[in-house]
């Protein structure tokens, strides 16, 4: 069974970022080859509205059969608010929490992000998973693209 990964906006932006492209591009190649199913949301689309055109195009190059598109709903908003209420992150990071909530609710295998401050961070990951368990949701694995590529792909 193919892995289903939820990507946040930082991963799309990482496609052209000199610091992250060496790990981001092989990940997108895996998606294009159908080795991975990518999950993204209308939140990602909203966050990309002011991005350069070439960044917006990254998502458009992915084959539709390798994509799951999801939308923000009341349950995702409620779960994101629980992360804030439980002090996993501050309220200014609500959209990061929405990404975590959407991935949790869609039962993604992994959330992939380059956001080390609010997402890919051991303390934050423990916090998100603590809230998930407290409210009856599954734990979620959170990684950077670097952890998902095969080094022979790089």
Indicate residue ranges for each PLM-predicted region.
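Short, charged/polar low-complexity linear motifs in solvent-exposed/disordered segments
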Residues: 31-32, 74-75, 96-97, 130, ...
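Residues at the C-termini of beta-strands that transition into short coil/loop
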Residues: 42, 73, 146
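Short, well-structured N-terminal submotif of metal-dependent ribonuclease cores
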Residues: 1-40, 47-61, 67, 85-91, ...
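Acidic, PIN/NYN-like endoribonuclease modules and their adjacent C-terminal/linker elements
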Residues: 2, 10, 18, 45-46, ...
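Active-site neighborhoods of divalent-metal-dependent phosphate/nucleic-acid chemistry enzymes
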Residues: 69-127, 149
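General small-molecule cofactor/ligand-binding pocket signal
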Residues: 39, 70, 141-143
